[in-house]
């Protein structure tokens, strides 16, 4: 049996240095993590999957559902009623949660910036999903997570937080990027096959 090809989610050095939407919301981050994937479809076909993210009544995070979606499978289709966004909307982090990621900024088919803030409004982190045109009609999905000065993982000092969060984030983010790419590209195959039917 042939081994499954490893698909990279590594951001290029240029992408790591490139300013992205949402960077201005945390001007002096204490940490930043970048990942990216090339999706073989146009931006307009990737965007709906980003717009409907979130746990609980939303489409899921397309990652490890037993960890971040209460074992409920993430959606395998675009859900029209979840496509409308507004700044200030909450994407529940977990099923049943009353808090979660707040929509801080978005531009359809270009970027979605989510964030986590404290009750007093201090911004702890931002999580930007950015769509850029790639070669041959593809899309480059770049994801950047930035931590503000107050960010800590279960009260641990920053040097420990950085190592733990980087490892967890890589695992979950890789799964999400692969999950989004699979859904978008599979939709293209379904459309192609359907178009061949008599």
What spans do the regions from the language model cover?
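Hydrophobic ligand-binding cavity/cleft-lining segments
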Residues: 2-86, 90, 183-198
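Beta-strand/loop substructures that line and gate deep hydrophobic ligand-binding cavities in soluble
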Residues: 15-16, 119-174, 178-182
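Short, surface-exposed coil-to-beta transition loops
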Residues: 32-34, 98-99, 122-128
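A short, structured loop/turn motif at beta-sheet edges
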Residues: 40-44, 104-109, 130-140, 182-189
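A structural signal for well-ordered alpha-helical scaffolds and beta->alpha junctions
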Residues: 43, 96, 173-177
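Short, charged/polar surface micro-motifs in flexible loops or helix N-caps
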Residues: 44, 55-56, 108-111, 120
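Edge strands and adjacent loops of beta-rich recognition modules
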Residues: 88-99
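Short beta-strand segments that buttress and anchor functional surface loops
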Residues: 89-90, 112-119
